[in-house]
C-alpha cells in the first residue's frame, strides 16, 4: 500500500463515516478505485454512513448522482448538513431566508418562507453571494433573525487541481457585519456526527469508528475529535501538502492515506 501513514490505527475499525466530495468523488469523477473499495468495505462487515456538507443540491439529487457514479448505497445511509438544517428549521419553527442554490431549495419547498424571516440559512450558493442577496440577509439579521450556517468550510475541490471558495467566508462576513454568531449544523458540529453514530448503533463506541475525509478541519476537527473518532485524512480532493499540520489544526489526524481505497486496503487486510 503506497503513501499511507498510521495504517495500524485501522485494525480495530468496525464502523466508518465517509465524506463524499473530495473523498469518494470530485464533481463527476470517482476517486481511484473508490467504487470497488466501498464494496470491499461492506464485504468486510464494516458499518458505513455517508456524512456530507454538500449543500448545492437536494438530498434526493445527491443520492441519484452517487448511484449514477456507480456507488451502491442506501438512501438512508446518507446524512447531509442540508437535511440537518431543515430539521433545525422545523424544530424551531423558523421562517427562513435561504441563501441556497435552486436545486437545494427544492428540499425546503414545504417550509414557510414568508416574511418577516426569523432565520437566515446559508449554504454553498455561488449564485446568491452577491451584494443584493447578502444585504437582504444582513437586513433580516438586523431585524432579529438567527444566523444558521449549514457549514463553514473555507473552500472545496471544484476539480482535482482547482479549489473554489466555500460558504465559510460569507457566513463570517454576516457574523462580522451583525455581531451575531452563526449556529453551525454540519461538520464538524458534534451533533451532526452523533446523528450518524446513533443510526449505526455505535454512539457508545466511537473509538472503533473512523471518520474519513479530505479536510482536516471540516471533516476531522471539532466533533470528530471531541467524540474520539479515528480520524483519517485522504490526499485527494481539497487536500494540499502540509494540511495535516496546519496552523489551525488542534490535533493531527490519526492516519494519512493517499486515497479512500488505500484505507480500505488497510482495513480488510488487517
Where are these regions (language model features)?
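Asp-based, Mg2+/Mn2+-dependent phosphohydrolase catalytic module
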Residues: 1-20, 26-44, 55-79, 83-270
